[in-house]
């Protein structure tokens, strides 16, 4: 046996290499899947951050147990949770109130302790040691005049409902603290400072007070409703794929067994996030490698078949010497299976090395390298498939009669086995059809191109030889010798069919893999662009809408492309968010695809310019002629204004009475010395239900500090007359402004300057409204604003599939305040480079605007790339490269095993009188045609397979409604991948043809040497 292997070293090496590739695919899949799982865990833990990943246990004191302290809670921590946690941080806390200064209302405050807190504070004074001692923040000390020795009182609850009211707890200040900003793993988002002086909107805007830090002794005999808290920071080094699920399970059990204990769900949320990715990894990675393994087994079968064909004479000789069919089978299979077995260890080592390389290129650094036990069944399966492939390759030869074995080529070799081909085509076709119709779905759809390519390749291998023979006969009639020889060669040589099948499958895998990777990347980038809106989104700290607009204008003046944006989040999660933008600059800064199709011109401000009030004193002549029914005071004419800071102001300028008609001269101070915008005019009426007032009010010569106001122009005012007849119609003539009013039930009526559209036009997405509908949305001030739907769109930048887009400049003219509790004030930047962002910060700082964190599209895209789907699909590129390598190996093996027969045929042709040019051209054409046809068919299979497979492949761990996935082929990538495969395989085919031609000798026609 060993002598036979040495005699055909090339074949033995080829069998061993292909067997190694089968084993490589089998071992690499579970090893790399495990690595992706490790990376998912790392990403989830790192992205969560210490404060989100920590588990908090909180137990409140009750009437029956009013002395709970942190050690009791710490004793409940299960071992599995403690195993993945750092040292616990414990403490007591009680939400109460304190009077910061005499005469002020009580402010809410938290009295608390924390493990080793004084080691994490900078204290002027000393740390609390006795009951009732506290340290206060430096901000509170400065704001309220607190200092060492200051005494404060905080109330406490009754221990029992009918117990007497307990005395307040007296606290003594013994120090002033500052909390450094560089210890996030200690505070875990629960910092004691940052609240001082901030108004509390839930409690009459009383100023906030930072936490009061005390010692645990303060809680021993006081505060019967306080809570004992234990926080367990996650230890990233201890959190593994095995330990973290155990910790999550233990946490769930702890909460079920202790209903009074509040248990954080951070461990469970991390496990759920990792598990979602693992579900995808467990399917995507194996299927990517399984289709490559299928090709490897197919190649092994073809290589073994070629090796068997070369041993036909040896099998015949063994049979003639008295060996039975079984004995001949044993000799042949032993010689062929031995290289296959020798290739398995090489495949294991190759898989591990490949995993190391791919991990370093795709996954985060410093991941633990593990070889899971799941490798064993995969390796065993690879061994069985490899041996089965060799057996099936040898079986037809072993069943042939001795007479047929004495021939170099089997009588049916040119046609192949119709039964085998039919079975392969039917099975592969059914698989591809099942995926196309949805009967088979999921990530297993990755196998669609391979199954389709196998079916097409086998059919083509059946049809192409007949077409080649037909072409050869036609070429012969036309005297085209080279084409005739090439056609007959393709028609009669089994190697041509084998090359065609392998090339088709390899090309399909390579082109599909490249296309799938790029299509997935494009969709991830599209989602990141939609969710961020612009290349860079910078948070800014402003309290007024004009400030936000001025900040963007300042950036624009300095050459920084920027657009102001405010995103307003409603209180209810079911309501649509509002995004207020500058329609003039958004299109220049936002990602083009996110604003494509948005009619931003519809949001543009009207042609009417704002009317500025150039002074303080308003003068005019006012006449009225009114009819009133019911009781009530005389109506009042008021001027509505907006201050430069965006605040709304109203000043009464005339009383329209006491008579039903009359005239008066006004000379009133508007109290707007900084210059205001004229927003509108209103008539305030009074009266009981059923009362009515109507008539006209005429204003002539309206001036401010002697300067006429341009209020009588055409289309300056907006009529507010409703369908019920109430409201104001405005008419102008000369310097006269006539208001035709109608009001009922004592309601006020008003008219507006037309510099702001009312209702505000809006672009809506998934709001349950139709084009032209009017409804209310939350505006930048946290109030309700009427909007009219100008158009419905599928998606909006930043708010994605559910939101309303309105004009920020329009809102700024009527709404100055920003509701900071619900509004994200942002500057969108076109330049996301570090230099561009730093330049924007410098300009904003010069304008007195504080800038905050910056979110970039690149970062958002990177988050999606660092997912099971992202990493798993990138593996398709590796599979495509290996597939082309396998196809090249088949070309080499078939050339090595068949060159003697080819040289003998060519030598016979030369002796018969054919020229060298015709012979060499025929051989090159024979080699190139099979490869070229396989490449074209494989590309077609890849495109059809993409249409079938891509809709079933998860592009994201968490799917989104928008943007709608664009699964159309990435044509440039398809062309590049096809060209790359063609360049490699066609060039290799030419090289092999040249190598065979160089071995051409005329004496080879006498017979093949053995």
Predicted regions and their residues:
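Membrane transport/envelope proteins' first extracytoplasmic loop
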Residues: 1-297, 306, 440-446, 459, ...
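Interfacial "coupling" helices/loops that link adjacent transmembrane helices in transporter permeases
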Residues: 8, 298-339, 889-931
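Alpha-helical transmembrane segments, especially those used as permease/efflux helices
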Residues: 10-15, 22-28, 217-225, 238-258, ...
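Short helix-loop junctions at transmembrane helix boundaries
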Residues: 348-374, 437-444, 936-979, 990-1003
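Juxtamembrane segments of multi-pass membrane proteins
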Residues: 440-610
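C-terminal transmembrane helical bundles of large multi-pass transporters
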Residues: 824-828, 850-951, 955-965, 973, ...
């Amino acid at each position: 046996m060993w002598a036979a292997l040495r005699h055909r070293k090339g074949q033995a090496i080829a069998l061993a290499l292909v067997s190694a590739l089968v084993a490589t695919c089998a071992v690499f899949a579970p090893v790399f899947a495990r690595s992706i799982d490790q990376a998912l865990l790392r990403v989830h833990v790192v992205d969560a951050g210490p404060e989100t990943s920590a588990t908090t246990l909180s137990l409140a004191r009750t009437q029956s147990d009013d002395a709970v302290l942190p050690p009791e809670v710490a004793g409940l921590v299960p071992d599995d949770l403690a195993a993945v946690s750092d040292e616990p941080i414990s403490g007591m806390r009680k939400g109460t109130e304190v009077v910061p200064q005499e005469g002020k209302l009580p402010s809410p405050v938290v009295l608390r302790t924390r493990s080793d807190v004084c080691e994490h504070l900078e204290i002027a004074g000393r740390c609390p040691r006795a009951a009732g001692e506290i340290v206060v923040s430096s901000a509170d000390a400065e704001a309220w005049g607190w200092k060492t020795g200051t005494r404060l009182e905080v109330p406490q609850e009754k221990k029992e409902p009918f117990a007497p009211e307990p005395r307040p707890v007296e606290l003594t200040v013994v120090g002033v603290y500052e909390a450094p900003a560089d210890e996030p793993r200690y505070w875990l988002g629960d910092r004691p400072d940052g609240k001082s002086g901030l108004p509390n909107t839930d409690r009459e805007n009383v100023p906030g007070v930072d936490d009061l830090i005390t010692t645990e002794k303060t809680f021993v005999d006081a505060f019967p409703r306080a809570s004992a808290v234990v926080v367990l920071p996650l230890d990233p080094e201890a959190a593994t794929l095995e330990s973290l699920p155990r910790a999550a399970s233990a946490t769930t059990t702890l909460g079920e067994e202790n209903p009074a204990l509040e248990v954080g769900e951070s461990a469970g949320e991390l496990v759920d996030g990792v598990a979602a990715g693992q579900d995808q990894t467990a399917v995507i990675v194996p299927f990517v490698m399984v289709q490559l393994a299928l090709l490897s087994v197919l190649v092994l079968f073809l290589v073994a078949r070629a090796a068997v064909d070369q041993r036909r004479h040896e099998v015949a000789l063994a049979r003639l010497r008295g060996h039975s069919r079984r004995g001949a089978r044993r000799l042949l299979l032993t010689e062929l299976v031995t290289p296959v077995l020798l290739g398995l260890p090489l495949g294991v080592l190759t898989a591990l090395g490949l995993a190391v390389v791919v991990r370093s290129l795709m996954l985060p650094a410093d991941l633990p390298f593990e070889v899971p036990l799941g490798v064993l069944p995969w390796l065993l399966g690879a061994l069985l498939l490899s041996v089965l492939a060799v057996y099936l390759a040898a079986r037809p030869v072993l069943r042939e009669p001795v007479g047929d074995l004495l021939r170099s080529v089997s009588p049916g070799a040119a046609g192949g086995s119709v039964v085998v081909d039919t079975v392969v085509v039917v099975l592969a076709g059914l698989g591809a059809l099942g995926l196309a119709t949805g009967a088979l779905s999921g990530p297993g759809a990755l196998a669609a191109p391979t199954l389709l390519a196998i079916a097409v390749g086998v059919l083509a291998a059946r049809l192409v030889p007949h077409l080649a023979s037909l072409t050869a006969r036609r070429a012969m009639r036309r005297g085209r010798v080279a084409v005739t020889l090439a056609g007959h060669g393709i028609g009669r040589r089994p190697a041509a069919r084998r090359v065609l099948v392998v090339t088709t499958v390899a090309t399909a895998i390579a082109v599909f893999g490249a296309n799938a990777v790029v299509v997935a990347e494009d969709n991830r980038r599209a989602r990141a662009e939609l969710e961020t809106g612009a290349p860079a989104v910078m948070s800014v700290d402003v309290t007024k809408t004009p400030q936000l607009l001025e900040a963007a204008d300042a950036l624009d003046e300095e050459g920084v492309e920027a657009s102001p944006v405010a995103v307003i989040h409603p209180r209810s999660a079911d309501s649509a968010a509002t995004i207020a933008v500058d329609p003039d600059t958004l299109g220049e800064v936002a990602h083009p695809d996110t604003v494509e199709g948005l009619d931003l011109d519809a949001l543009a401000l009207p042609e009417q310019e704002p009317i500025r009030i150039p002074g303080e004193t308003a003068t005019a002549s006012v006449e009225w002629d009114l009819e009133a029914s019911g009781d009530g005071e005389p109506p009042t004419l008021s001027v509505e204004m907006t201050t430069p800071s965006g605040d709304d102001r109203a000043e009464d300028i005339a009383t329209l009475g006491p008579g039903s008609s009359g005239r008066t001269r006004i000379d009133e101070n508007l109290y707007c010395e900084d210059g205001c915008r004229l927003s509108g005019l209103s008539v305030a009426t009074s009266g009981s239900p059923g009362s009515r007032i109507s008539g006209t009010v005429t204003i002539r010569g309206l001036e401010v500090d002697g300067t006429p106001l341009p209020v009588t122009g055409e289309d300056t005012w907006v009529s507010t007359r409703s369908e019920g007849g109430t409201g104001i119609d405005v008419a102008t003539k000369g310097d006269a402004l006539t208001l035709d009013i109608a009001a009922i039930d004592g309601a006020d009526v008003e008219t507006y300057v037309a510099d702001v559209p009312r209702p505000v036009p809006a672009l809506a997405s998934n709001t349950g409204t139709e084009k032209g509908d009017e409804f209310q949305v939350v505006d930048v001030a946290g109030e309700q604003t009427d909007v009219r739907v100008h158009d419905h769109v599928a998606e909006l930048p930043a708010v994605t599939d559910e939101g309303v887009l309105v004009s920020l400049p329009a809102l700024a003219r009527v709404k100055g305040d920003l509701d900071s509790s619900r509004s994200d004030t942002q500057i969108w930047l076109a330049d996301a480079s570090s230099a561009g962002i730093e330049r924007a910060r410098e300009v904003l700082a010069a304008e007195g605007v504080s800038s905050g964190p910056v979110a970039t599209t690149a970062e958002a895209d990177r988050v999606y790339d660092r997912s099971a789907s992202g990493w798993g699909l990138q593996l398709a590129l590796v599979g495509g490269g290996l597939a082309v390598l396998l196809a090249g190996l088949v070309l080499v093996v078939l050339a090595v095993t068949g060159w003697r027969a080819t040289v003998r045929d060519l030598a016979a042709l030369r002796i018969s009188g054919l020229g060298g040019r015709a012979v060499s051209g025929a051989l090159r054409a024979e080699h190139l045609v099979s490869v070229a046809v396989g490449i074209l068919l494989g590309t077609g299979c890849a495109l059809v397979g993409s249409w079938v497979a891509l809709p079933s492949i998860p592009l994201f761990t968490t799917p989104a409604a928008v943007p709608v996935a664009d699964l159309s082929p990435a044509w440039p990538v398809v062309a590049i991948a096809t060209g790359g495969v063609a360049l490699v395989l066609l060039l290799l085919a030419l090289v092999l043809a040249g190598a065979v031609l160089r071995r051409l000798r005329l004496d080879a026609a006498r017979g093949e040497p053995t």
